[in-house]
Amino acid sequence: MVQNSHWLLTKNIIMQKAYLLFGEAAASLQLILDAGNSLQYDLLTPSPKIARGENYKGLPYVMLDYPRHFSKEDIFAFRTMFWWGNFLSFTWHLKGRYALAYRQVIISHHKQLADAGFHLCISEDEWQHDFEATNYFPIHDLSTEAFAMLLDNKAFTKLALKIPLDQWNHANEALMKNYLLILELVKISYQGGEKDPLPGNPKADFGL
């Protein structure tokens, strides 16, 4: 293995392809968000961040965070991940005031999220990304009542979608389809009801 330079070159090519895929996804998201003047939101202001590493549970990965807002108390992030030999994934990660703000619209769209193949994080560790049974549970296997109860009992919410690596050639389309689904939930949350879910932030139309 140490004498096989071809293996390392192949790995570098694949990692670069993942990096380019996420760059395209980030650019498409920026166009959508810019069209809705949504960059006025503090949580959408930071530019896309693409990182790569060599050791998530012993394997290389590439990760895109955009839009992204991380603080000790509050999180709003779209996290897209390529995990070597496992999957591509898209996660909507909410914590603190953002988890509270979007809870009701998430519950009311239980069926849409289930039909799209999303999973709900049931782990107490919000920084685990695998789809083991101790970490994620398929939303389509949860009743609306059970779904709501699980959301109520956690300080954070993570909704995640797994894209098998054998669907790589269609990954960009799958990512955009599900980015738009979640952005539609964000849009509904801002437009619905009498109370702005995030007081002090101007409302936006994502133009979907």
Positions of PLM-derived features:
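Charge-rich, low-complexity N-terminal segments
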Residues: 1-71, 75
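A structural detector for beta-sheet-dominated domains
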Residues: 67, 121-123, 162
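Short, charged low-complexity intrinsically disordered segments located at boundaries
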Residues: 51-60, 95, 135-142
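Aromatic- and glycine-enriched beta-alpha-beta binding-site module
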Residues: 55-115
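Long, solvent-exposed, polar/charged low-complexity segments
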Residues: 1-34, 135-208
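Short, internal acidic amphipathic alpha-helical interface segments
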Residues: 97-151
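Short, solvent-exposed polar/charged micro-motifs at secondary-structure junctions
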Residues: 48-53, 129-134, 168-173
